[in-house]
């Protein structure tokens, strides 16, 4: 449980760099439809500078694509994670190797997801245990700067296929909203 909490905390922590970069004075909600912008402006004005806060989801709300999946692929590509370094307690099923293909962590993760999402999601969070927050943030920063799809091979049944895994792409409209909220004294938390 401690590992899962740390992984969730890291997910929240690493998004702070994007928020801090987007907070500049008098941000306009240019990427929002006019009726929604008007409603948001009213809500922000009503709640400004009163110690209020707003909480948002991260994956596919604050940005497009999944952080954990792309971070797994990125850290495996960089050699920070590997099946050899995988703790024994996270080896839930045998790796599926052939003479032509040695299964990596992305393929292993996908096979766990084929079994059950309730298995693969906690698993991928626990894969990052053992890294300090500073180390993980460095890897997330590297992933966000990479800006290219990551290549990985995986099993689809018994066939090896190639995946193209996109790193997260922050939604401009959400970045504007976060900046405007913070400019008006409303703390923003992204989980």
Over which residues does each language-model region extend?
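Bacterial N-terminal signal peptides that target proteins for export
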Residues: 1-9
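Generic low-complexity, intrinsically disordered sequence content enriched
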Residues: 10-12, 23, 44
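Boundary at the C-terminal end of the N-terminal hydrophobic targeting segment
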Residues: 16, 20-27
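Bacterial N-terminal signal peptides
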Residues: 8-18
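Alpha-helical substrate-recognition element adjacent to the catalytic core
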Residues: 26-191
């Amino acid at each position: 449980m401690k590992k899962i909490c740390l992984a969730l905390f890291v997910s929240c922590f690493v998004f702070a760099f994007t928020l801090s970069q987007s907070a500049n004075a008098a941000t306009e909600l240019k990427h929002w439809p006019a009726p929604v912008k008007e409603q948001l402006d009213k809500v922000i004005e009503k709640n400004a500078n009163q110690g209020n806060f707003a909480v948002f989801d991260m994956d596919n709300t604050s940005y497009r694509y999944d952080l954990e999946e792309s971070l797994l692929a990125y850290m495996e590509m960089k050699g920070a994670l590997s099946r050899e370094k995988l703790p024994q307690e996270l080896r839930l099923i045998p790796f599926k190797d052939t003479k032509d293909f040695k299964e990596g962590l992305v393929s292993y993760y996908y096979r766990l997801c084929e079994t059950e999402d309730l298995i693969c999601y906690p698993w991928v969070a626990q894969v990052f245990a053992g890294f300090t927050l500073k180390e993980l943030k460095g890897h997330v920063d590297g992933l966000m700067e990479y800006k290219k799809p990551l290549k990985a091979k995986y099993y689809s049944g018994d066939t090896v296929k190639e995946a193209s895994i996109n790193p997260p792409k922050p939604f401009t409209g959400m970045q504007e909203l976060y900046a405007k909220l913070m400019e008006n004294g409303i703390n923003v938390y992204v989980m």
